Structure formats: structure tokens, C-alpha cells
Amino acid sequence: MIAAVDVRKTFGDVTALDGVSVAVPAGTVHGLLGHNGAGKTTLVNVLTTLFVPTAGSATVAGLDVVRDAAQVRRRIGVTGQFASVDEDLTGTQNLVLLGRLLGASRREASQRAAELLELFGLAEAADRPAQGYSGGMRRRLDLASGLVGRPDVVFLDEPTTGLDPESRLGMWDVVRTLVAGGTTVLLTTQYLDEADRLADTITVLSQGQVVAAGTAAELKSRVGRRTVSATLAAVNIGPALDTLRRAGLDPLQSGRTLTAPVESSRALAVVVRALDDAGIEADELGLHEPTLDDVYLTLTGARP
């Protein structure tokens, strides 16, 4: 549904994208992860026909973003980092206006507006001016605006930036609803948990280049294994070290906590059984997976 091949974009002497390739199957969420200036928004602008690539090629819904730009625009919806709604108009008026501009009859536009306001939990505020909406409500109205034309592909450029936790969770639910209905979503974000929760596949950008791509699980597997940890009740951890080594583990000590890399989640049961057989009491036991934080720090040396 979305394909970028060796896309390069320069602005004078500045290279914003340097040979970026991305492939997004239909009906999935693809996350673009990267710090400010990594090239996320520039790539979105190329894919949405706002920028012409300096080199390389890209298609959206099978249409070339340069040759078929007008057709691409009719197949996509775009939501930026900041809500772009007319604050003097009501929620309904904003959506009806867009529907009419897209060629719908007044009846069709009104019906579509009502559907979207209900979907985004804005029905009760439909007749209120948007200037009275909260930040989360404006962002939802902005996303609804991008769906008036029933797009096949939706680009969400950092849609939850600046939102409170509750509003972020609400936006996540909306994205899941879109994908369940068959919409393809490309999501740019600086929030690692957002990419982990929503994206089927992820591309990590740094300085305009792709440094990694794959599912969250695949990316995590590249930077380290699972670990088990045991925080002991006793200060003397010598016996516990010996016990875990005899169980085939290679524990490291930090205070009263022992940590060991493991291949399988079943190792937690091995640790519990070994400590119990030795009569060693643990205050806390845990199994820890690598996180996207670990992935990003390993790949780029910085946090997004």
C-alpha cells in the first residue's frame, strides 16, 4: 500500500533523507521512529506529495507520488502534529465543510460528519465551536477531518504530541479502530511505547537514514536477550550466586539483586525452583524483555 525506494531529499546542502526505503502492507500500522530532525516528517511530506523527492521513488495505493500526485491526495488522509481545524466553526461545521469541498452533497457530508463525530466520541460536542474543545478533542476532530473522504491510507505525524495520557490512550483506540476497518496507517512518533503498542512494523530513522526495520519483537531481539532478576532478602548473596551458577545461569550482582541473561521465559521457573530448593528467600523475582528504549539507544546512541 505504501512503498518508498531509495528516497533522497535535499534542501541545498542539507540532506534530510538519504536513501530511505519503507514498505507498508495494506491494513497495517507502520511506525516511523526517530528523534527530532531524523527525517520522519520529511518522509511523510514526500509520501503525501508535499515534497518532490530529489531521488528515488515512492508509491501510495499503487500511485506514484510525483506523476499521480492529484490522485494520491484523493486516496489519503493526513493529520499533523498540531490540530488544524477552524476554531470558529462547530465540530459538525468543520467536517461538513470538508465534505462539501471534496464534492459530497450536503446530505452526504452531514451524514459522514455525524458518523465521524460518533466514532471519535465528539457527538455531544458536535454543535459547540471548536475553540471550546480541549487539546485532545481538537486532535480527534483533526483526525476525523482527515477521514471525511474515506481514505485508504492515513498519515499520522506525531498525533499525540502534547496530549495528556488519557487523550493519548483515546487516540490509540481510534487508530486500532481504523486498522480494524481496513485502513493503512503510517504513524510517526517519538514515543517508544506508542510504537510498541500500535505498530505492526517499525522503521527507525537517524540522520535521514534507516538504521533498523522490522517488528518490535525483531528489533528487540537485535539488542539483547531476556533477563531474570532476583532481589534477595538476605545481604549475603554468595550462596545464591553459587545456586544459580549450578542451575546453568551466569548471574551478575548489583547490591542484593542478581541478574542473568536467559533464552526462554521458562528460566524464571528454574530460578524459583533453584532458590527454593536451596532455602534462599527472594523479596522480588522478575523476567525482563528488551524494550524499544534499549533498541533506540543501541542503534542511535540517543533517546528520541
Task: Show which residues each predicted segment covers.
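Structured loop/turn residues at secondary-structure junctions
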Residues: 125, 135, 233-235, 263, ...
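ABC transporter nucleotide-binding domain
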Residues: 171-262
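Short phosphate-engaging motifs
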Residues: 16, 194, 236-239, 267, ...
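C-terminal coupling/interaction segments
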Residues: 263-304
